[in-house]
Curated annotation (Swiss-Prot):
The keyword Cell cycle does not apply. The gene is rpmJ. This is Large ribosomal subunit protein bL36. GO terms for cellular component: ribonucleoprotein complex; ribosome. One of its GO terms (biological process) is translation. Belongs to the bacterial ribosomal protein bL36 family. Disulfide bonds: none annotated. The keyword Ribosomal protein applies. The lineage of its organism: Bacteria, Pseudomonadati, Chlorobiota, Chlorobiia, Chlorobiales. Keywords: Ribonucleoprotein, Ribosomal protein. Signal peptide: none annotated. GO terms for molecular function: structural constituent of ribosome. InterPro entries: Ribosomal_bL36, Ribosomal_bL36_sp, Ribosomal_LSU_bL36.
């Protein structure tokens, strides 16, 4: 999981979700697209 100050969807399968006040990008098709904002 990579940490960025601004997160973006890297493919059409990526989803942006909020958990515990943090924003995450989750991608089941390509797990290397996982990101966290902070």
């Amino acid at each position: 999981m990579k940490v960025y100050s601004s997160i973006k969807k890297r493919c059409e399968h990526c989803r942006i979700i909020k958990r515990k006040g943090k924003r995450y990008v989750i991608c089941k098709v390509n797990p290397s697209h996982k990101q966290r904002q902070g």
